[in-house]
Amino acid sequence: MPFSSEIKNFRLSCLMNQTEFGNALGVSFTTVNRWENGKARPKIKAMKALKQYCEECGLPYEPLEKSWRENRIQEGAV
């Protein structure tokens, strides 16, 4: 599954809107929107914040990380 779909499904499973999710991760609503629309992908700093959020809430991080890494490989960003 593309990262954009993974991150959107994750946010929805947390019952958050884009603004709330962005606030939880320390990014803007616009940033979350761009991730979900496939126009941008999180930088490493945002992925670390996402991992911390998952750990604090007892949520699985691995599917998000896997999708993010696969997306980076496909784009040649490794």
Predicted regions located by residue number:
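A detector for short, charged/polar N-terminal pre-domain segments
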Residues: 1-2
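Short basic helix-loop element that most often maps to the first helix and adjoining turn
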Residues: 5-20, 49
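Residue-level recognition of specific faces of alpha-helices
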Residues: 6, 31-34, 46
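Residue-level detection of the helix-turn-helix DNA-binding "recognition helix"
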Residues: 12, 26, 37-39, 55
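Short alpha-helical DNA-recognition segment
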Residues: 15-34
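Short Asp/Glu-rich motifs
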Residues: 30, 41, 73
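DNA major-groove recognition helix of helix-turn-helix/homeodomain DNA-binding modules
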Residues: 43-63
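Short, charged recognition helix plus adjacent turn
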Residues: 44, 61-78
